[in-house]
Design a protein with these regions (language model features):
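Positively charged n-region of N-terminal signal peptides that target proteins for export
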Residues: 1-3
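Bacterial N-terminal signal peptides
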Residues: 6-16
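Catalytic glycan-binding domains that act on GlcNAc-containing polysaccharides
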Residues: 21-137
Length: 137
């Protein structure tokens, strides 16, 4: 948990200049790469369609261990670009922020959880996929 604290502190303490026109990019060494099996397992466990998760992955285009800044001060982390606004909820479920960033399997599980959460909120897979990245256009 201590490593997760330092990771989050590093992300939030970057200079304001990092939030200029370009997105700041921070890269940490991956713990475990994302594989197709990771995505298949996440889909199976969450009950979400595997095709939806692969579509989100293709759209988000992140990398294991990589974080990209957003203009609102949040960060998108890992292959599925899970936004840091979800980290407290994930931590309450026992998922460390560092794992979401650096472990491809955990990132896929977090993405599947988020898609499932949006599906439960909207009742529509298409709306859930649309809301995955942002609820606002």
């Amino acid at each position: 948990m201590r490593a997760a604290f330092f990771l989050l502190a590093a992300l939030w303490l970057l200079p304001d200049a990092a939030f200029a026109a370009e997105r700041a990019r921070v890269v940490f060494p991956p713990l475990r790469p994302l594989t197709a099996d990771c995505v298949l397992d996440a889909a199976h466990i969450s009950g979400m369609p595997v095709a939806a998760l692969f579509a989100i992955l293709a759209t988000e285009g992140g990398k294991t261990g990589e974080a990209l800044s957003n203009r609102n001060g949040t960060w998108d982390i890992g292959p599925f670009q899970v936004n840091t606004i979800h980290l407290n909820e994930l931590a309450a479920m026992g998922i460390a922020p560092d794992a979401v960033l650096r472990d491809g399997r955990i990132n896929a599980y977090a993405a599947a959880w988020l898609l499932r959460k949006e599906y439960q909120r909207t009742g529509s897979l298409w709306q859930a996929i649309g809301a995955y990245h942002s609820r606002t256009p």
